[in-house]
């Protein structure tokens, strides 16, 4: 009862002081803003007792209403700077701003004290996703580079000894045969693109190979379902569901069962990236890209156009490079095209953001869309113009 009275009193005072509400400083360039995270600075001279009372009331918001997003993370009391940081929804941050004890509020951001890495010998695709404008020749990324994140690669298998993977690839499961190898090369190429030392987006992420397609690059939907299910169970058993990416650079006609399997991975807390397909048709007719919560990725070209082969439609989250992409093959580097590789870029950026921003899997696709740049010039009228961007600030 005391907590209810305390919160009610705080809200009443907030409403009375709305005229003198603290300023919520503009975020400006939002590339490095941490979603729903704020730094709250208190007015000069506020007593320790008043500060403690305020933070106690803030902590009580969540206890009284589970729908309220309010989580106080850190407090600080430096010489002339007293305040705290936390995660708050829009309504709550407005209530906090209305407290006369608050001086100003600003968005929390990613600090780059660790520095950015600039890869000089990068392919056009890596350069493109780390720069807002075309023509760059380097890949710019934070050196966290997906560290601590695993990518469950549901595909043709992976040559785990490929030098570009730097020993960070392991076998997970095989639903095709008794041969733990990649007889096609598709999976190895994707592993290199997602996490390779030279060709990769998230250069410190781990790859887990789940084989559901044979040496011809084909397999049953039942294999695909088994592969996704294995990823979900493995992540749960190892406590890494929110640090797991599932890459689905495969698919075909609509399947409710395949979509449900992909949706289960999303509900388990994972970020799932899926290729929309390369039949130049509406992607809502394909699975698993049409599954709810899955990040459906279309393919773009070097000149920021939608690839002519790429599927399209309202389910597309973003475009990503998918034409003339170089990565590791079975016999050295090869160049390939397809929406499979667009999805691989998104999986890499997903792993990168999970490591860098410490966000949850269900936030990754939204964050990818927030960072993306609207530059695709010829996308169909019912399809986004957004192009994948890692938020490097370049």
Curated annotation (Swiss-Prot):
Pfam families, from UniProt?
Inhibitor_I9 (PF05922), Peptidase_S8 (PF00082)
**Which GO terms fall under molecular function for this chain's record?**
serine-type endopeptidase activity
Q: What top-tier enzyme class does this entry carry?
A: hydrolase
Q: Which InterPro entries does UniProt cross-reference here?
A: PCSK9_ProteinaseK-like, Peptidase_S8/S53_dom, Peptidase_S8/S53_dom_sf, Peptidase_S8_Asp-AS, Peptidase_S8_subtilisin-like, Peptidase_S8_subtilisin-rel, S8pro/Inhibitor_I9, S8pro/Inhibitor_I9_sf
Keyword flag RNA-binding: no
What GO terms fall under cellular component here?
extracellular region
Biological process (GO) annotations held by this record are: proteolysis
- Which region is the signal sequence? 1-21
Q: What does this protein do?
A: Secreted subtilisin-like serine protease with keratinolytic activity that contributes to pathogenicity.
Q: What is this protein called?
A: Subtilisin-like protease CPC735_005570
Task: Give the taxonomic lineage as stored in the record.
Answer: Eukaryota, Fungi, Dikarya, Ascomycota, Pezizomycotina
């Amino acid at each position: 009862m005391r907590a209810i009275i305390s919160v009610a009193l705080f809200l009443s005072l907030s409403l009375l002081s709305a005229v003198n509400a603290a300023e919520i400083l503009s975020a400006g360039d939002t590339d490095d803003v941490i979603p729903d995270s704020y730094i709250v600075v208190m007015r000069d001279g506020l007593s320790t007792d008043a500060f403690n009372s305020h933070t106690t009331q803030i902590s009580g918001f969540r206890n009284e209403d589970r729908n309220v997003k309010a989580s106080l993370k850190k407090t600080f009391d430096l010489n002339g700077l007293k305040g705290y940081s936390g995660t708050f929804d829009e309504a709550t941050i407005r209530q906090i701003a209305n407290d006369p004890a608050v001086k100003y509020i600003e968005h929390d951001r990613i600090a780059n004290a660790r520095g950015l890495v600039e890869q000089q010998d990068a392919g056009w695709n890596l350069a493109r996703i780390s720069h807002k404008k075309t023509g760059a020749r380097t890949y710019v990324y934070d050196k966290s580079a997906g560290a601590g994140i695993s990518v469950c690669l549901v595909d043709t298998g992976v040559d785990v000894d490929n030098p570009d993977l730097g020993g960070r690839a392991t076998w997970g499961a095989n639903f095709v045969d008794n041969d733990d190898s990649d007889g096609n090369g598709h999976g190895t190429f994707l592993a290199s693109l997602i996490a390779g030392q030279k060709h990769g987006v998230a250069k410190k992420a781990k790859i887990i190979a789940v084989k559901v397609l044979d040496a011809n690059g084909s397999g049953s939907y039942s294999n695909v379902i088994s592969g996704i299910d294995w990823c979900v169970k493995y992540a749960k058993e190892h406590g890494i569901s929110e640090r797991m990416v599932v890459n689905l650079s495969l698919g075909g006609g609509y399947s409710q069962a395949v979509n449900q399997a992909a949706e289960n991975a999303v509900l388990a807390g994972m970020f799932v990236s899926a290729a929309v397909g390369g039949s130049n048709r509406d992607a809502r007719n394909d699975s698993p890209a049409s599954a709810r919560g899955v990040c459906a990725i279309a393919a773009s070209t070097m000149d920021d156009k939608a690839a002519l082969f790429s599927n399209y439609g309202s389910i597309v989250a973003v475009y990503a490079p998918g034409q003339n992409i170089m990565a590791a093959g079975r016999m050295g580097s090869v160049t390939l095209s397809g929406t499979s590789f667009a999805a691989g870029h998104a999986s890499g950026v997903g792993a990168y953001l999970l490591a860098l921003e410490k966000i949850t899997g269900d936030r990754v696709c939204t964050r990818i869309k927030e960072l993306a740049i609207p530059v695709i010039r010829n996308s169909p009228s019912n399809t986004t113009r957004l192009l994948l961007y890692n938020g490097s600030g370049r």
